[in-house]
Regions:
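A conserved acidic beta->alpha catalytic loop
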Residues: 35-44, 86
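Acidic donor-binding/catalytic loop of UDP-sugar-dependent glycosyltransferases
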Residues: 41, 89-102
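N-proximal low-complexity "stem/linker" segments adjacent to membrane-targeting elements
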Residues: 1-20
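Catalytic core of nucleotide-sugar-dependent glycosyltransferases
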Residues: 199-200, 204-207, 213-238
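Conserved nucleotide-sugar donor-binding catalytic segment
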Residues: 92, 114, 138-215
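Short aromatic/hydrophobic "clamp" motif used to bind/position activated sugar donors
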Residues: 82
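Flexible acidic/His/Gly-enriched loops in nucleotide-sugar-dependent glycosyltransferase catalytic domains
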Residues: 53, 66-71, 100-102, 106-165
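Short, acidic, metal-binding catalytic loop of nucleotide-sugar glycosyltransferases
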Residues: 19-28
């Protein structure tokens, strides 16, 4: 088992991350840490830890970015299975063992995540709590695939994947947007099978300097650019034009993003009555609330439409 640990300026939290990996019950693992241009002493913390634990391999780079750091770590991995961890997070001591055991019992699966918890509570906002509840509700391949244009359905740090599958799609790409969702989309397109353990085996630390909050690659605009490209190469490939359905600002943003690919725009009334008008696919539904998505999903499938072939949800 090879664990990929990219690091940049994580000194306050790195010792906890390393300790959580060192105490894994799966002793036969290696941690490949890439210090990507840290200026806060993270590199020195890694070197000291490597002298104590030969399972820790350290490389230093001048700051090429997260996708490059992950690609370097992947190239150094020796095991057929690789896992991810972020330098400011922690893994449950049974995490690697349970994921590897599950994958051994399910040879058709290629990518496996886990449920997670957010900590500390006083740094966790309402939006992240909603996201975590949504993430933890998606356990199957099909549920993650159908929500792929909502947000990343599998937290990057929880990933364990077959190394060869990652290599087959070229690993992580630098395209100026979320590298994890970009990777998931390419893996789903190539037929990789996803799953998620129902156990909470990963702790995602919340703090004001986390990349999720500060890195522009995770901005709403960049996410929408990635999703719109996926739509153009997926549901709307070949120049297909869609009916766009939604409410308010979200509807307007998606209309602007998809432009000429939108043939008709339909704004929903609030509250939505549940009645479904006669609609011709393809349909793009900018519906933010999970409960509303479920109502629309049931109604459209009840009309004989197929999700991902005739309609998709976006956010």
């Amino acid at each position: 088992m090879s664990v990929l640990l990219p690091v940049r300026d994580a000194a306050p939290w790195l010792p906890s991350a390393l300790a959580s990996l060192a105490r894994q019950t799966l002793a036969d693992h290696e941690v490949i840490a890439v210090d990507d241009g840290s200026r806060d002493g993270s590199g020195e913390i890694l070197e000291r830890a490597a002298r104590r634990d030969p399972r820790l391999v350290v490389r230093h780079t001048p700051g090429h970015g997260l996708p490059a750091a992950l690609s370097l770590a992947l190239s150094l991995a020796r095991a057929p299975w690789v896992a991810r961890q972020d330098a400011d997070d922690v893994s449950h001591r049974m995490r690697l063992a349970r994921q590897l055991e599950w994958l051994g019992a399910h040879p058709d699966a290629n990518v496996l995540g886990t449920r997670l918890r957010l900590f500390p509570a006083n740094a966790t906002g309402a939006g992240m709590k909603r996201w975590a509840a949504w993430h933890n509700s998606l356990l199957t391949h099909d549920s993650m695939r159908r929500e792929l244009l909502i947000d990343s359905p599998l937290a990057h740090g929880t990933m364990m994947a077959r190394r060869s599958v990652l290599e087959d799609v070229g690993g992580w790409h630098e395209r100026g947007w979320a590298e994890d969702l970009d990777l998931w989309m390419r893996l789903f397109t190539r037929g990789a099978r996803f799953a998620k353990l129902p156990d909470v085996l990963y702790g995602w630390r919340q703090h004001r300097t986390s990349a999720t909050r500060t890195d522009p690659r995770y901005s709403r605009e960049r996410f929408m650019s990635l999703k719109s490209e996926a739509l153009r190469s997926g549901l709307l490939r070949g120049g297909r034009k869609a009916t766009l359905i939604g409410v308010g600002a979200s509807l307007s943003r998606w209309h602007e993003m998809l432009g000429s690919r939108i043939e008709r725009r339909m704004e929903l009334r609030r509250p939505h009555t549940g009645a479904v008008p006669s609609l011709e696919p393809p349909l793009v539904l900018a519906v933010m609330a999970p409960v509303a998505r479920e109502r629309w999903r049931a109604a459209l499938c009840g009309c004989g439409l197929r999700e991902l072939s005739d309609f998709v949800f976006v956010a």
